[in-house]
Amino acid sequence: MMSVGIDCGAKTTKVVVVKDGRIIGKAKVLSGFDQKKSIIEAWDLALKNAKISADDVNRICGTGSGKNVVKFALPNTRDLANDIKAMAKGASFYFPKARTVADVGAEEGRAAKLDEKGNAVDFAVNEKCAAGAGAFIEAMGRALETPLEQMGPLALQSDKEIPMNAQCAIFAESEVVGLIHRMTEKQDISKAIHDAMASRIVSMIHGSESTRTW
């Protein structure tokens, strides 16, 4: 059985090729303005990495904020899964004993509680502010003149505790600017930013209350 999963997110599009429960190929590209083009680009690259052709694929499933575009780009797509279900099944695939999973996407953060079969039985989504999403880290990185990819490793160089109280990404950026003006080390600011996001995610996990069904 050859299956392909496509996650068309706000920032990146990811494709994974699975054969009999084993990942044999994958690819990731920037989503860009033309999501259809990004999906096809990631699809072609993943199939190339897996050393298979489109005719070898038995099943295609799409998820992510652009999941409806997946079916438009690849008409043979059979299934569309919402983000919570895909997150739960993905976490369970890698960590069968996991009962709590958090996913920080570019535009929103999500948390879910899983049962022993990897089904999400409770969940919460932060959709109101970028302060709980990857865009928050990216925006703070711009204030620090540091690329997103370097923010995590930079934070790991610090062991200081600097509280950030702002619950809004705009006000948080003002806090970061204030820390810069006080000559705070860049790695300490980066750690404070990550700690603030982690705190929001933990609060979301503890306060998860299912408000939607799928």
Can you say where each PLM-predicted feature lies in the sequence?
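Adenine-nucleotide phosphate-binding core of ATP-dependent small-molecule kinases
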Residues: 174-210
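Short glycine-rich, Thr/Ser-proximal phosphate-binding strand/loop in the N-terminal lobe
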Residues: 3-41, 45, 122-123, 127-128
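Glycine-rich phosphate-binding loops at beta-strand->alpha-helix junctions
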Residues: 64-66, 211-214
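Phosphate/pyrophosphate-binding loops at sites that engage ATP/ADP/AMP, CoA/4′-phosphopantetheine
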Residues: 43-58, 201-212
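Conserved phosphate-binding catalytic cores of ATP/NTP-utilizing and phosphoryl-transfer enzymes
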Residues: 67-105, 110-122, 202, 206-209
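Short glycine-aspartate micro-motif
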Residues: 3-7, 59-62, 99-102
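Glycine-rich phosphate-binding loop plus the immediately following alpha-helix
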Residues: 32-35, 117-160
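A mobile "lid/hinge" subdomain adjacent to the ATP/sugar-phosphate binding pocket shared
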Residues: 151-189
